[in-house]
A protein has these predicted regions:
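Di-metal (Zn2+ and/or Mg2+/Mn2+) metal-binding site signature of metallo-dependent hydrolases
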Residues: 1-14, 81
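Hydrophobic side chains within alpha-helical segments
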Residues: 6-8, 57, 83-84, 89, ...
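Active-site phosphate-binding strand-loop segment of PLP-dependent enzymes
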Residues: 18-84, 89-99
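PLP-dependent aminotransferase class I/II
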Residues: 21-25, 30, 34-36, 43, ...
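Short, well-ordered alpha-helical packing segments
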Residues: 11-14, 38, 102
Length: 223
């Protein structure tokens, strides 16, 4: 179920299901009342994770999105707020989860862990700190390591990120106002509950299927 005003899931819907974890998508730069959702998750012992790939920089009640859950994902794919061409990031304050993510990111090895965590793992599984320890697989893993070129591109863009986010916000204001004022055709997306909207795109929710089909037809071959 979705709330068309905020482009988000309604918090009361969450209460209907017996969940162990919730992977919440902050869609297109917007979010629902995530503080309410977090309170529900805390009360019901639901692990809250944020998919923040489209909302880098959006602020809600004094906090940037991506800081409400146990962890948050960010995408640096082409077209997002900042780009490394491919790749992304996972942010967390949980040391146990961070250790697991570093292991899974690189084949299941412990090479990217600090010395203390390496020693703890090797002691737990009785692995000698020799040549063989570098080729011990502690878990199923992938090769998700970014390249130096991707990292260079990302680092170069960081100093422009604030400017990019502000420009996206300004573009959204300029484009959305005339669209949402046409209340006979479109639902207005509310963003006043946000301290800052770092949107990914301008959501257009048509009031009828006919209006939607007209827009799609006009964009054929253009987009």
């Amino acid at each position: 179920h979705a709330d068309q005003d905020h482009v988000g899931g309604l918090p009361d819907v969450l209460k209907k299901y017996n969940l162990r974890a919730l992977f919440l998508t902050n869609l297109l730069g917007f979010c629902d009342d995530i503080d309410v959702i977090k309170k529900i998750c805390d009360a019901r012992k639901i692990i809250l994770l944020e998919d923040n790939c489209e909302s880098l920089g959006t602020e809600y009640q004094g906090k940037k999105l991506g800081n409400f859950g146990l962890a948050a994902t960010f995408s640096f794919y082409v077209g997002h707020h900042m780009s490394t061409i491919e790749g992304g990031a996972v942010l967390t304050d949980d040391k146990k989860l961070a250790t697991m993510l570093r292991i899974v990111r690189a084949h299941g090895w412990d090479r990217n862990l600090d010395l203390v965590r390496q020693e703890n793992l090797r002691k737990k599984y009785k692995v000698n700190s020799t040549f063989y320890s570098r080729y011990t697989f502690y878990d199923l893993g992938y090769n998700f390591r970014t390249t130096e070129i991707n990292g260079f591109l990302g680092n170069r863009q960081l100093k422009f990120l604030g400017e990019i986010i502000k420009k996206r916000r300004d573009n959204f204001r300029e484009m959305s106002v005339p669209i949402y004022q046409n209340s006979n055709r479109y639902f207005a997306i509310k963003s006043r509950h946000l301290d800052f909207c770092s949107n990914f795109a301008v959501p257009i929710i048509c009031k009828t299927q006919k209006i939607r089909d007209e827009l799609v037809a006009k964009c054929a071959g253009i987009i």
